């Protein structure tokens, strides 16, 4: 049985994805764990639960800019979101890598 995300959990995952994308685009690397937003106290177990996750990027006009994910629960949720965010920004075969001048206009969505 899959447990739905709370609004706070969802917002936190989006913050993690955005930080991952910014680091990948601006510094051409994945962020270290300590560079990601801290998970709310008492909820770190949720971040460690194995879940599938997708990160979708859209432009300001609503057009797709990237989408990559893990459909199966093969990684802890935090790792899955970082993996999907990196993929959506840098490895979606339909699009070139996200550029630094695109970052401000991108909408980041996490599905888990």
For the regions a language model picked out, list residue spans one by one.
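Basic nucleic-acid-binding interfaces
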Residues: 1-112
